[in-house]
């Protein structure tokens, strides 16, 4: 009984030990269950995160759609503003055309009036000839009433003296005619020089147009190159999107397979005997993980290489930006050449305006001289011969004036042709600018799309990296679990050895257990084979995925580099577009105010023109009355001269008759000579004294008449010149006067430069500075200054002061303005580049 009790106690101890072992096993099972629950929770969290990611992706898509709608609205608004600006510009253009047509209509009316007045002058000349014939008849009647011989002798003496003086005057007038011919030759030479300058200007304009056409072809080639680049970028983005989709599908499949594997591992972890064999599998996995780490290092090296490639791409971007800057500079050069052509055309128009002002000044002088002719018209009794000569000269002058008119018309036609060419060039530039703007908008839209695609790709890549990190953490946890299980298995082996020593008595029971264990081993081997097959398949799939991931990473890095380049270009373009939009808005607002001012000023100018026309009409009427008076006086003078000629002829005949009678009467009157001598001496003394006084008075009067007659002749020439609107009046001044005029007109270059009515603003302006805005000098101020400088009182003096017009202070050289703009753009570009480089460094860090 005692022995049995001892045996029972031993058995009870063994049972207690086995119960403790069973409790430890139960604890291990609970721990594995806890790990499985943790894995379930992590999988649920990952599912929630995926749902959130999808929800956020939908939100981003909606935001992208809203942004696209806003951008389209902005584009439509900008196009509406542009259309409004073009409409305003066209309205102003039509108004200017209407004003130009009105001015041309007025010029045609003036020409018609001038032709009518010429016809009237021809009729008056015919009437004058008729009156001259009548005066001849009257002179024959007056010859019969003149019988006194002594008075006729005195008159013949005086007429001889007058003839001498007239010969002197003729000589003087011939010298003046030579001087005028020299001045005409000089004017012709100047006109030829102007024609040559115009030809040179036309040649330069043709050359510029050819160069611009070549440059436009280059721009079109550059456009085609850019379009090819854009298509390539689109193709690359499409391929990247397809690859990302395939990768997403593969990741989803891998996640499903991982879930299945986790369920199988949970089932197999309940069995303790499998842990021994699972140890080997864990070692294999460790080796595979080492290989994965080596591959990750390779990937890091490839990332470094990709960064180098990104740097090279940045260098290429800089080269492209430099090319764009050179193209922009070429565009600026073309604009400068256009401005030079505009300035040359303006100079030619200014020269024409100066000639018109000179004609107006000469008209004013003619008006003053006509006033002086009214006083001197009574003293023109003995100048009929000179008037005939001067009539011939006037015809010559009129022919010269007509020739000069024709030359002026040719010059005006050439100027109009140049203006038409300028308008064509401006239209071409505007069309080119519109094309650039459209291309910029298309590039913006494409870049926005590429940015959004790149952002989505980056987000997906980041999520994949996070998933990879999670998988790495899981692998590390599994490694730790495998190590713990291997330690636990070693401890179990030691305990089993102790139990084998103790279980010699229970070998029968163990045999039964061994049979069960053999069955379990067979099942384990079959499970191992299945597991190995699954692991081999998974390893192959993992290797394929690694290769595809490497390729995708390379492509993603390339896409990142391309996206960075596109983002940089887009930011630069956005900044420039924003600056240009702001400047265009400011310029449009300012130009609106200035257009209103211009319209008001043009209305005031039209009022002034109407007042001037009324004044000119009043002056024309006064001149016509004066012409009629002067012609009447000339007719009376011609009649008197014819009477005097007939008297001279009669006196000559009477002298011959008296000489014959004296020869016959000499013999008869020798005795009465002594008595008659005393009486004749007394009479002769009484007659000579008044004749001497008369000769002195006549000499003094004629010396004044010569000067006045010169003025009268000049006025007659100028009166005929005023009948035409665009004619040059030719004077016959002395040599001293010619020298004085040459000295006076030396500084005409400065006056021409200063004499400006400015109406300029930059079409291709990019900035809203004060120098690029309208700078104006109203024509009212210029007309008032011209009138003050050329007042009618000032023309009485021989000196003429040159016109001096003050230039406005707002004018600045165009070269300085462009340099300021280029410096500002350079500083803005430098700051933008620095900021972008800093942002890129932060992203890479």
UniProtKB/Swiss-Prot annotation:
This is Synaptonemal complex protein 1. Its main location: nucleus. The gene is SYCP1. Residues 657-845 are annotated as: DNA-binding. It comes from the Eukaryota. Pfam families: SCP-1. Residues 550-644 are annotated as: Required for pH-induced assembly of C-terminal ends into antiparallel tetramers. Residues 64-211, 244-544, 620-663 form a coiled coil. Signal peptide: none annotated. The molecule is in a coiled coil structure that is formed by 4 polypeptide chains. The N-terminal and C-terminal regions exhibit a prominent seven-residues periodicity. Residues 684-703 have a biased composition (Polar residues). GO terms for cellular component: central element; chromosome; chromosome, centromeric region; male germ cell nucleus; transverse filament. Structural component of synaptonemal complexes. Homotetramer that consists of an N-terminal four-helical bundle that bifurcates into two elongated C-terminal dimeric coiled coils. This tetrameric building block potentially self-assembles into a supramolecular zipper-like lattice to mediate meiotic chromosome synapsis. Self-assembly is likely initiated by local proton density at chromosome axis, which is predicted to trigger antiparallel back to back assembly of adjacent C-terminal ends into tetrameric structures that anchor to chromosomal DNA. GO terms for biological process: cell division; chiasma assembly; lateral element assembly; meiotic DNA repair synthesis; protein homotetramerization. Keywords: Cell cycle, Cell division, Centromere, Chromosome, Coiled coil, DNA-binding, Meiosis, Nucleus, Phosphoprotein. Residues 59-215 are annotated as: Interaction with SYCE3. Major component of the transverse filaments of synaptonemal complexes, formed between homologous chromosomes during meiotic prophase. Required for normal assembly of the central element of the synaptonemal complexes. Required for normal centromere pairing during meiosis. Required for normal meiotic chromosome synapsis during oocyte and spermatocyte development and for normal male and female fertility. The modification Phosphoserine is found at residue 676. GO terms for molecular function: double-stranded DNA binding. It comes from Mesocricetus auratus (Golden hamster). Residues 684-709, 786-808 are annotated as: Disordered. It is found in: Nucleus; Chromosome; Chromosome, Centromere. A motif (Nuclear localization signal) lies at residues 553-556, 753-756.
């Amino acid at each position: 009984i005692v022995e049995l009790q001892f045996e029972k106690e031993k058995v009870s101890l063994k049972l207690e030990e086995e119960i403790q072992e069973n409790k430890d096993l139960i604890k291990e099972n609970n721990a594995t269950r806890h790990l499985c629950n943790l894995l379930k929770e992590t999988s649920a969290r990952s599912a929630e995160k995926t749902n959130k990611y999808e929800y956020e992706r939908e939100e981003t898509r909606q935001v992208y759609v809203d942004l696209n709608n806003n951008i389209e609205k902005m584009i439509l608004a900008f196009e509406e503003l542009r259309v409004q600006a073009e409409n305003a510009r066209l309205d102003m253009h039509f108004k200017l055309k209407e004003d130009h047509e009105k001015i041309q209509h007025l010029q045609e009316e003036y020409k018609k009036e001038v032709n009518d007045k010429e016809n009237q002058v021809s009729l008056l000349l015919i009437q004058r000839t008729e009156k001259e014939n009548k005066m001849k008849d009257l002179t024959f009647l007056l010859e019969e009433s003149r019988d006194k011989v002594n008075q006729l002798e005195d008159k013949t003496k005086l007429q001889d003296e007058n003839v001498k003086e007239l010969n002197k005057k003729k000589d003087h007038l011939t010298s003046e005619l030579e001087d005028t011919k020299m001045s005409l030759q000089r004017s012709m030479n100047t006109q030829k020089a102007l024609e040559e300058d115009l030809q040179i200007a036309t040649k330069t304009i043709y050359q510029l147009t050819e160069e611009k056409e070549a440059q436009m072809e280059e721009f079109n080639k550059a456009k085609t190159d850019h379009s090819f680049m854009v298509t390539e970028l689109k193709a690359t983005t499409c391929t990247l999107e397809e690859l990302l989709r395939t990768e997403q599908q593969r990741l989803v499949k891998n996640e499903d397979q991982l879930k299945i594997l986790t369920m199988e591992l949970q089932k197999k972890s309940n069995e303790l005997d499998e842990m021994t064999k699972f140890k080997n599998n864990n070692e294999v996995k460790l080796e595979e993980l080492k290989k994965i780490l080596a591959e990750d290092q390779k990937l890091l090296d490839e990332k470094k290489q990709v960064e180098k490639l990104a740097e090279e791409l940045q260098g290429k971007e800089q080269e492209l930006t430099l090319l764009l800057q050179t193209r922009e500079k070429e565009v600026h050069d073309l604009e400068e050449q256009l401005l030079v052509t505009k300035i040359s055309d303006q100079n030619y128009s200014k020269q024409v305006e100066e000639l018109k002002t000179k004609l107006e000044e000469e008209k004013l002088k003619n008006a003053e001289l006509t006033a002086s002719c009214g006083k001197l018209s009574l003293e023109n009794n003995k100048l009929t011969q000179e008037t005939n000569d001067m009539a011939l000269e006037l015809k010559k002058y009129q022919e010269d004036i007509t020739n000069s008119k024709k030359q002026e018309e040719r010059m005006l036609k050439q100027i109009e042709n140049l203006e038409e060419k300028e308008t064509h060039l401006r239209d071409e530039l505007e069309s080119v600018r519109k094309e650039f703007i459209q291309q910029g908008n298309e590039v913006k839209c494409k870049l926005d799309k590429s940015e959004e695609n790149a952002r989505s790709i980056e987000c997906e890549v980041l999520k994949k990296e996070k998933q990879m990190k999670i998988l790495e953490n899981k692998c590390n946890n599994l490694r730790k679990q495998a190590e713990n299980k291997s330690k636990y298995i070693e401890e179990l082996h030691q305990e089993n050895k102790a139990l084998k020593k103790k279980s010699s008595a229970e070998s029968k029971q163990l045999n039964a257990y061994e049979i069960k264990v053999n069955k379990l081993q067979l099942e384990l081997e079959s499970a191992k084979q299945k597991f190995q097959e699954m692991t081999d398949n998974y390893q192959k799939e993992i290797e394929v995925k690694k290769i595809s991931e490497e390729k995708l990473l390379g492509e993603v890095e390339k896409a990142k580099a391309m996206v960075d380049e596109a983002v940089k270009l887009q930011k630069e373009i956005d900044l420039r577009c924003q600056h240009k939009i702001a400047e265009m808005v400011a310029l449009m607002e300012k130009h609106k105010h200035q257009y209103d001012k211009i319209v008001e000023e043009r209305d005031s100018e039209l009022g002034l023109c109407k007042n001037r026309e009324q004044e000119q009409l009043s002056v024309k009427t006064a001149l016509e009355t004066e012409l009629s008076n002067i012609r009447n006086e000339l007719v009376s003078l011609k009649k008197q001269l014819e009477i005097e000629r007939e008297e001279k002829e009669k006196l000559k005949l009477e002298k011959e008759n008296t000489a014959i009678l004296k020869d016959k009467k000499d013999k008869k009157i020798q005795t009465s000579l002594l008595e008659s001598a005393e009486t004749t001496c007394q009479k002769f003394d009484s007659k000579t004294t008044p004749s001497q006084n008369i000769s002195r008075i006549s000499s003094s009067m004629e010396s004044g008449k010569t000067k006045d007659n010169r003025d009268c002749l000049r006025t007659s020439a100028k009166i005929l010149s005023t009948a035409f609107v665009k004619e040059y009046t030719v004077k016959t001044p002395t040599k001293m006067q010619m020298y004085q005029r040459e000295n006076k007109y030396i500084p005409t270059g400065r006056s021409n430069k200063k004499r400006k009515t400015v109406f300029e603003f930059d079409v291709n302006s990019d900035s809203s500075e004060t120098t690029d805005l309208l700078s104006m000098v109203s024509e009212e101020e210029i007309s008032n200054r011209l009138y003050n400088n050329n007042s009618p009182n000032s023309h009485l003096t021989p000196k003429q002061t040159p016109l001096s017009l003050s230039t406005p202070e707002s004018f600045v050289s165009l070269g300085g303005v462009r340099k300021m703009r280029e410096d500002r753009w350079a500083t803005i570009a430098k700051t933008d580049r620095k900021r972008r480089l800093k942002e890129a460094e932060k992203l890479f860090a």
